[in-house]
Regions:
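Membrane-embedded alpha-helical bundles that constitute the cytochrome b-like, heme-associated redox core
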Residues: 1-169
């Protein structure tokens, strides 16, 4: 068992953070705010594609994932709950964004490429609100996740944060 995450998983992890922050800071109706909207949709779709790649890469490197020993069984349950909630949101938020966009316009050009949209008769306003709510909740959860990593590093002084950092020995 290694004490660091494999490099491809580290790259996906930190690239996802960058893209989520980009998606969050460019949030808004992409059919109104054209330039930032394009960045929003690009970052959001990239998060979704990276999520799919992440699942494949993690299953390939299954045996090389560090076993950061939990301090108690409650901590392990909490870690797994946060992990699977993050996973679900990485999937759900972009999909809801895409459904909302499909209801707001009949065609959408992303860097001159026509994005495939679905025709639907759902209440786009509500789906848009849910997308926004989950987007905001996601940032709060990431904040807790990051805080936990920092507490591990500075208070418990263990290997958890270092296991996701390339440079730190
Ligand atoms: C991790 C990915 C994403 C995050 C964190 C995110 C977050 C957000 C947030 C917070 C808003 C509300 C902004 C505001 O009104 O102040 C928003 C709006 C919106 N997003 Fe996303 N988004 C993501 C991905 C996507 C994707 C992939 C699409 C489309 C393919 C999309 C389409 C939209 C649309 C259409 C709105 C406007 C909703 C409305 O006005 O009702 N988003 N997004
Ligand atoms: C978009 C933001 C983030 C997402 C979606 C995210 C998601 C995840 C996920 C799902 C894992 C479990 C490993 C895996 O399946 O890849 C993980 C592990 C980890 N993350 Fe994040 N993370 C984010 C941001 C951060 C930040 C800002 C920090 C630190 C400041 C951080 C530190 C860590 C550490 C140290 C681990 C290893 C935990 C362990 O194995 O015990 N993450 N992250």
């Amino acid at each position: 068992m290694k004490n660091k995450y494999p490099l491809p998983i580290m790259i996906i992890h930190w690239l996802t953070l960058f893209l989520v922050v980009l998606a969050y800071t460019t949030g808004g109706d992409p059919t109104v705010h054209l330039k930032t909207g394009e960045l929003h949709v690009f970052a959001g779709i990239s998060v979704f594609l990276l999520f799919l790649i992440r699942i494949i890469i993690i299953s390939i490197y299954r045996k090389d994932i560090p076993l950061n020993k939990p301090r108690s069984k409650y901590q392990r349950t909490l870690f797994l709950m946060v992990k699977y909630t993050l996973y679900s949101l990485l999937f759900l938020i972009p999909v809801l964004g895409w459904v909302t966009l499909s209801g707001l316009t009949e065609s959408y050009q992303l860097f001159a490429i026509s994005l495939p949209l679905i025709s639907n008769s759902w209440d786009v306003e509500i789906i848009g609100e849910v997308h926004e709510f989950l987007g905001n909740s996601f940032m709060v959860l990431i904040g807790f996740h990051a805080l936990a990593a920092l507490i591990h590093h500075y208070v418990f002084k263990d290997n958890v944060l270092k296991s996701m950092l390339y440079f730190k020995k």
